[in-house]
UniProtKB/Swiss-Prot annotation:
Complex and partners: Homodimer.
The encoding gene: dapE
Pfam families the record matches: M20_dimer, Peptidase_M20
Name used for this protein in its record: Succinyl-diaminopimelate desuccinylase
Protein residues bound to Zn(2+) 1: 67, 100, 163
Organism taxonomic ancestry: Bacteria, Pseudomonadati, Pseudomonadota, Gammaproteobacteria, Lysobacterales
Cofactor dependence: Zn(2+); Co(2+)
Length: 376
């Protein structure tokens, strides 16, 4: 017999919600949560669906945060089975979103239903927040909802994000923060000319090389708590016409910083602009701020999560701030303590994405235990 969480996960996977599409996932979830007594509010913006569902009232406010969108699967022929036709083989569920993160979303729903059935008059507020704009631009999703919450004065005390955080077994890692992310697109201007007459041209590659070398060599910090040191990586670089006898007129450089709480986007931007100015470059520089770092220090949420995950996994979890960004970066500035707890992440964004059925079926109890420890 198929378990409730497995069936719901399959129903969600079958809805091909490639970002920013939701494909009916949130309507299905809202129907279930409404039937369980949750008040559901749809906060759609443009092509993005956002769902805010609450049960109870007052403080403390505990939010289960997730996303219903998925990354594109690529050619279906590369998959062993249709990425949007979920299939269980040898105790493993395959399909796009199985691990990232429709399994966690389904487990949130089942855990929330079970919790309010057992504790209909529970203290505080249990909330579920879902978006279809996590894997894409992340502008009209939780970023937008967080702005609405700030305007409303919506308090959030604790936030559990269901991102796939585990590495080898369910519960072996507890995400307690994330680095900030800042991207820059730099264009260094020169003067195009013939390579035989360099005195009549200005080579932007040569002009920029010392500045780029300084950026790459810089030790930005030594890390922070469990954060690795801030890192700057050049991701793309382009210049030239394709001909080997033409000095290019401009150099294009794309770079990204993943940074610790020692910094914020504004201070990093100032540092880099000052460096470029010292090298007397003629340039333009466009920034994209993906999110500031966040960190949950030792406290109730972190202690409870460590104890619950340790009981489930059989050993205390590693407490980490690694990985990319998540939507928790938009909730943390509201004053919330944020953690991330979810299934094994080995196959996310890959062909034949999958999750162990045993892990999936354990997730609702894991989330329900966290909710009970925090609210009851």
């Amino acid at each position: 017999m198929t378990s409730d969480v497995l069936q719901l996960t399959c129903d969600l996977i079958a809805r091909a919600s490639v970002t920013p599409a939701d494909a009916g996932c949130q309507a299905l979830i809202a129907d279930r949560l409404s039937a369980a007594g949750f008040a559901c509010e749809h906060l759609r913006l443009g092509a993005v669906d956002n769902l805010w569902a609450t049960h109870g009232s007052g403080a403390p406010v505990l939010v289960l945060l997730g996303h219903t969108d998925v990354v594109p699967p690529g050619p279906a022929s590369d998959w062993a089975s249709d990425p949007f036709a979920p299939q269980v083989r040898d105790g493993v569920l395959y399909g796009r979103g199985a691990a990232d993160m429709k399994g966690s979303v389904a487990a949130f729903v089942v855990a929330a239903e079970q919790f309010v059935a057992a504790h209909p008059e529970h203290p505080g507020t249990l909330a579920v927040l879902l978006t279809s704009d996590e894997e894409g631009d992340a502008i009209d999703g939780v970023r937008h909802v967080a702005r609405l919450f700030a305007e409303r004065g919506q308090q959030i005390d604790w936030c559990i994000t269901g991102e796939p955080s585990s590495t080898e077994r369910l519960g072996d890692l507890l995400r307690v923060g994330r680095r900030g992310s800042l991207s820059g697109n730099l264009i260094v201007k020169g003067v195009q000319g013939h390579v035989a007459y360099p005195h009549k041209a200005r080579n932007p590659i040569h002009l920029a090389a010392p500045a780029l070398a300084e950026l790459i060599a810089r030790q930005w910090d030594d890390g922070f708590e469990s954060f690795p040191p801030t890192s700057l990586q050049i991701s793309n670089i382009h210049a030239g016409t394709g001909a080997n006898n033409v000095i290019p007129g401009e150099l294009q450089v794309a770079f990204n910083l993943r940074y610790t709480p020692h910094w914020n986007a504004e201070t990093l931007e100032r540092e880099i602009v000052a460096l470029l100015e010292r090298h007397a470059l003629t340039y333009t520089l466009a920034w994209h701020r993906s999110g500031e770092p966040f960190y949950t220090p030792e406290g109730t949420l972190r202690r409870v999560a460590r104890e619950v995950l340790g009981a489930f996994a059989g050993a205390p979890p590693e407490e980490s701030t690694g990985g990319g960004t998540s939507d928790a970066r938009f909730i943390a500035p509201l004053g919330a303590q944020c953690i991330e707890v979810g299934p094994v992440n080995a196959s996310i964004h890959q062909v034949d994405e999958h999750v162990r059925v045993a892990d999936l079926e354990a997730l609702p109890a894991l989330y329900r235990t966290l909710v009970e420890r925090l609210l009851v």
